[in-house]
Structures are given as C-alpha cells and as structure tokens.
Amino acid sequence: MLVYLAEYLTQFYTGFNVFSYVTFRAILGLMTAMVFSLWWGPKMIARLQVMQIGQVVRNDGPESHFSKRGTPTMGGILILAGVFISVLLWGDLGSRYVWVVLFVLATFGLIGFIDDYRKVVRKDTKGLIARWKYLLQSVAALVIAVYLYASAQSPGETQLVVPFFKDIMPQLGGFFIVLVYFTIVGSSNAVNLTDGLDGLAIMPTVMVAAAFALIAYLSGHVQFASYLHLPYLPGAGELVIVCTAIVGAGLGFLWFNTYPAQVFMGDVGSLALGAALGAIAVLVRQEILLVIMGGVFVMETVSVILQVGSYKLRGQRIFRMAPIHHHYELKGWPEPRVIVRFWIISLFLVLLGLATLKLR
C-alpha cells in the first residue's frame, strides 16, 4: 500500500525512491510484524484468558502436558494479523504472488479457526471432523493449484526444480496441479502435527520462511537466477516481503510461546503457516527443497504414518507415542531439550537446503 504512496511522493522528493527496493521493504516488513506481535501479544493473551479460550489437552497425552490445560490458545491469530498488516503496508498489492499467499493464509487460517473453536468452545479434543477438515483443505488447495496452472506466464512457473541437478527441470504439465495440491495440504498438516511443544513449530517455520525469502529474492533477479540455474520468475521478489513478515510475526509470537508458553498458536496458526510455506515453495518452484529444509515437519509426519501403519498391520507401535517429539518426552527428555534439539536439526536442514543452490 505504502509503495504506491512512496511512488507518488518520489516526484517531490527522490529519497522516497528507497521504498522501491524489495530489501528495504522486507526489513520494514519484518520489523512491523514483530513489533505488532510484541505489542498486541499481552493484550490478546489477557483477552483470551478472560474469554476462557484455553488449551484442551488429550487425556491420553503425556502427563507433563496436563499442566498446560487452560493455557490460552488460538494465538495464531496474532501471527496472521501481524503478517497481513505488514504485507498490506509494505507489499506490492499488484503482485499476484502476494495475493496467492494471503489467500492461503486466510483460508487455511479459517479452517484452523473452526477446528480450534470446536475444541475450545465445545470441549471436543478432536476438533473439526477429519474428513471435513481434509475436504476444506483440499478445496482451498485445488483452487490455488488450478489458478496457478491457468495463469502461468512463463514455462519456468510450471517446471520442477531438482536440487543438485542444474539441467533437470522437467515440465510438469497437468501433474503440476497434483504437486501443488499435495505440497500445500501436506505442508499444512505437517506443521500442525509438529505444533505439540512450546515453540517447537514456530522456530522451524521462521527458519524456513527466512530461507525462502532469500530464494524468492534470487529467483526474481534475472542475473542471480541465471547464475544459480534457478527459474527466473519476474515479480517473485515480492514474496520476500511475505516471508520476512512471517519471520517477524513468528519471532514476536515466540516471545510468548517459548517454554513455558503463555499462549499456543492453535490450528488457526499451524494450518495457515504450514500451508503458506507450501504455497511459497510452489511459487518459487522449490517443492523438493521444502522437503529438505522442512525436514523436522517431514520427520514428525512420517513418525505418525509409521506409527499408525505399524499398529494397524502388526498390532505393535514403533514409538512410545507419535508424533515423535512425544516419544522423546516419554523417554525422559525434558521438554526444552526436545525443542532446542529439534531447532538445531531444523537449522542444519535449512542450511543444507540453501547449500543445494550452489551445489549443482
């Protein structure tokens, strides 16, 4: 929004031209989202407490989690508000890249809100019925997939980028829609499964978003994209604003979500942020890289799949409890140890993912 105002004011004072630089607006976007989260966080937590919107803890969960019962939840609203305000202020609202991610955040955030509402108000620990949740996610993801396929403006927008191989970029054709669908829905649910300990999901989300900010900048710059053998995506640089807004809002939220948490993000936050990461990965054509950098999310999801599959096929469990972070809790690891070690793994995987940009 302010981009257009600055563009108009440039004719009176050339100093306003600084707002045309993506990097400058990205910094302001990060700071805006973070300051908003830090400022509004205490007010929102107090309001949630008054409204008795507290976490509902499963009776079959780890005993250490029983003390979390009643902790304010649905704090993801704080993150989403920070991202939206920041992007609307500093982003180029003429960019379809920006609106795609905002649409994903809004729709998946709404799905998560409905899920949280059922848990908190109706005291139903299962929340929204799984098939309805999956159906709503599927509709939203397919809308985005079809739109991106139909509106593709260059061959690079529907290619598959394979890390480590600079000459392998196959055109996906109609399979593009399938890939987009599974990337967005899968990423959304993976982050949701990871959000089981204080700060466990938000920090890897911040790291991956920061990495995608760099990748979006490189992909939107013709010289950098050519040098690194990335698809050149004109306008993709505006995704940097979205990514840094997620980083800023996420760090601001972490201030209150770090152990012991004062507030949880709830499904309204985890489903939306996961879907947003998936959408960003699709937009910059780095779905495989998301699997690498978001390895912690993948690990959590695979642990659930293996646990359920093993129990149904053999009647035995592989882990003491899934997702896998609960397994380590039941092994006696203190919660902060599990969280920080998963953060370290996430940092390593993000750096590995960034290294693949050069290792081609």
From Swiss-Prot:
Positions of disulphide bridges: none
Similarity annotation: Belongs to the glycosyltransferase 4 family. MraY subfamily.
The keyword Transport is assigned to this record: no
Domain of life: Bacteria
Pathway the protein contributes to: Cell wall biogenesis; peptidoglycan biosynthesis
NCBIfam families: mraY
Subcellular location: Cell inner membrane
Name of the protein in question: Phospho-N-acetylmuramoyl-pentapeptide-transferase
GO CC annotation: plasma membrane
The protein's enzyme class: transferase
Required cofactor names: Mg(2+)
HAMAP family: MraY
Listed GO biological process terms: cell division; cell wall organization; peptidoglycan biosynthetic process; regulation of cell shape
Catalysed reactions, as listed in the record: UDP-N-acetyl-alpha-D-muramoyl-L-alanyl-gamma-D-glutamyl-meso-2,6-diaminopimeloyl-D-alanyl-D-alanine + di-trans,octa-cis-undecaprenyl phosphate = di-trans,octa-cis-undecaprenyl diphospho-N-acetyl-alpha-D-muramoyl-L-alanyl-D-glutamyl-meso-2,6-diaminopimeloyl-D-alanyl-D-alanine + UMP
Function: Catalyzes the initial step of the lipid cycle reactions in the biosynthesis of the cell wall peptidoglycan: transfers peptidoglycan precursor phospho-MurNAc-pentapeptide from UDP-MurNAc-pentapeptide onto the lipid carrier undecaprenyl phosphate, yielding undecaprenyl-pyrophosphoryl-MurNAc-pentapeptide, known as lipid I.
